[in-house]
Amino acid sequence: MADLNARRGTRIIYLLLLSVQVIGAFFLIATVLPDFRQLALYPGEQLPYLRGDDFALVVAIVTMQAAYWYRLCRVPIPFQGSSIILSHMSLFLGRLSFIFGGALFALVFFRHVPELSDSTDTALMARRGLILAEMLFALFCLTLDLERLGTALGSNQQS
């Protein structure tokens, strides 16, 4: 009975930590989407600085990273080979989260940065570049976690 309760507790903690990461990713994407559109329409124009946006992004990134690293180091994946459909959905969501990160990276570094003018605020650009790198890493970590879950859920399936 104690073992059953421990496994149930591990499942709840695992799902809670994964949910924190997924909700954080949705928040990042929803927050950055208007900027993404602005960069696509007006490459080279520096976006206006809003202190609250940077703070909210950093809080979301730190929260996602705390959940990821705690889960990775302390909470094993409690699901094994139970559903090929859930396995595929998890793998798909993992890839989908990183597609957005890849699209944002490509837009910023291959379209926006080459068009920047000499009057660009380099300190602001560096700060935003650091936040972008942190955001891409958080999305990458979420991708890894979803792929680990998908692999575990599909471990008993024939290829």
Where do the PLM segments sit?
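Membrane-interfacial segments
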Residues: 36-40, 76-80, 110-118, 150-157
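Hydrophobic alpha-helical transmembrane segments of multi-pass integral membrane proteins
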Residues: 21-28, 58-68, 97-108, 138
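Transmembrane alpha-helix entry/boundary detector in multi-pass membrane proteins
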Residues: 13-17, 39-64, 87-91, 124-132
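Hydrophobic alpha-helical transmembrane segments and immediately flanking/interface helices
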Residues: 44, 114-142
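Loop-to-transmembrane helix junctions at the membrane interface
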Residues: 71-99
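Cytosolic juxtamembrane helix at the C-terminal end of the final transmembrane segment
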Residues: 70-79, 135-159
